[in-house]
């Protein structure tokens, strides 16, 4: 955003066209809060940091994919439950589009049956669960609100760290995000 604005573009000319890709993992409550925090932070950044006036610039548009890394080969049918919970967290967090992994992807390419179940998972959530009837079904939940606030605070601190390095381009030049990705990958393993 900063580079585009420095080049003379108006934030409201490009921000409404930006979209993002997220992954959703197994911690249901944390994942819902993550998406809610992302939406709040995006609106804040667009309004307060970049001065966006168009309400569409304040809206975070994002696609979500369930986390293939969470799928297990030993009992692949249990992955149906994992994917369902992840998909539900994404929907309750406000995703605009969703990809649900097939339960057998830990073993290789998905079978036709597994792909059909992944599709039916989305259809049941959208058409039978009732959660899509609400804009923010979990808004007001103490647990969700507290987690959302914690995530917003941590992300704000992280953004401040990047700003202190001179912005994202400078941070990349210094290897900061690369080191962070390596560190988190090591911790995850």
Short names for language-model regions:
Residues 34-35, 76-77, 102, 112-114, ...:
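Composition- and surface-driven signal marking solvent-exposed, interaction-prone regions
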Residues 73-82, 109-115, 149-150:
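Conserved phosphate-binding loops in nucleotide/dinucleotide-binding enzymes
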Residues 111-112, 120-123, 127-189:
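Flexible, glycine-rich loop/tail regions that form catalytic "lids" or insertion modules at the edges
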Residues 41, 87, 120-124:
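Generic recognition of well-ordered alpha-helical segments
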Residues 1-29, 46-73, 88-107, 124-145:
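Core alpha/beta catalytic barrel or barrel-like domain that forms the active/cofactor pocket
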Residues 71, 77-86, 96, 185-189:
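Non-catalytic terminal/interface segments that mediate subunit docking, oligomerization
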Residues 1-6, 31-45, 78-84:
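Active-site cavity-forming subdomains of large catalytic enzyme subunits
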